[in-house]
Amino acid sequence: MSTVQTVLGTITPNLLGRTLTHEHVALDFEHFYRPPPPDFESELKAKISMSTLGYVRLYPYSSKENVRFYDEEALEAAKKDVLLYKKHGGGSIVENSSYGLKRNLEFIVELAKSTGVHFIAGTGHYIHAMQDASHASLTVEQMSDLYSKDIITGQQVNGQMVKCGFIGEVASVYPIHDFEKNAIKAAGEIQEVLGCGVSMHPHRVTKAPFEIMRLYLEAGGRADKCVMSHLDRTIFDIDELLEFAKLGCYIQYDLFGTECSFYQLNTSVDMISDGQRIDNLIKLIKEGLVDKLLMSHDIHTKHRLTSYGGHGYHHIHTNILPRMFDRGVTLEQVEQMTVTNPANWLAFDP
């Protein structure tokens, strides 16, 4: 029987409830720090407060405090928001911190125990530039062995074996680095053997998701067990997105809550708004793709947590879904995107 492998053990898919499929509760994002504009250097070097928050929202990756999403303050704020997520109807969170992002399995387990939210942890590799010496030269075979052990055997955390429940996020730049190609191929190989879900992080160019899927499918991975993340900042043209959808993977809009006039990680594009995300999802629903759509926030900086003036993990449930209902999306369609699709993606027979 297919089950979902959480950090506290396996559960039946129907117990997941509403699920956020791409989040982080602790990670190190300092690699993406950008020097602040000279005019705002003092504000962005200062501690985040009401008097500096406006600058942090404009230049989130220019505040070192903001990208340190792993210190005690961040963990306390994340726990508070997971509890709010639970209060507002949240059931499960898929934690996408992989090798290179300094995943904190101990904290994820503690959150699962203390909040009652189901957590599914990922294995896999982030971009090559963020790997330490022990991982930077791994072969496909070594990666495959590592991923399978993380899923089948698990890692010891405070005396208990904690197993990962999917492979992800598997991240790449563009052109895709050879190390990242190995990670994508290893994900495809292990997916074929184990049947688990996989989540991909493409670079911020339209060609990237297509190339990732080619490598993954050639390695043996199933399209219907693969999520392509961050498509709301990668493929902006709906016709092109529909063309990509023909490959059969899940289409994930996972930057809900990110609304900015200046996108620091790709200054050549304008980040779409939540309203535009809703409109695009409605267009995809009308094209018959409701069974391939997923939604999340990809929270990875402090300023998106409520303790720092952000929206928290409950934003989709409390602010986005009501707007979708107002625009004619049905409860059945919302349940498909937030409950059924995540369960179908995550369920496998380990």
From Swiss-Prot:
Residues bound to a divalent metal cation 2: 169, 201, 230
Cofactor binding: number and manner: Binds 2 divalent metal cations per subunit.
Keyword list, A-Z: Hydrolase, Metal-binding
Its EC number is: 3.1.-.-
Q: From the UniProt record, which GO molecular function terms apply?
A: hydrolase activity, acting on ester bonds; zinc ion binding
- Tell me yes or no: is Transcription among this UniProt entry's keywords: no
- Entry superkingdom: Eukaryota
Q: Which InterPro entries match?
A: AryldialkylPase_Zn-BS, Metal_Hydrolase, Phosphotriesterase
Q: Which residues bind a divalent metal cation 1?
A: 22, 24, 169, 298
Cofactor(s) recorded in Swiss-Prot or TrEMBL: a divalent metal cation
Picking any one GO biological process from the record gives:
catabolic process
- Family according to the record: Belongs to the metallo-dependent hydrolases superfamily. Phosphotriesterase family.
The protein's name is Phosphotriesterase-related protein
Q: Which organism is it from?
A: Drosophila yakuba
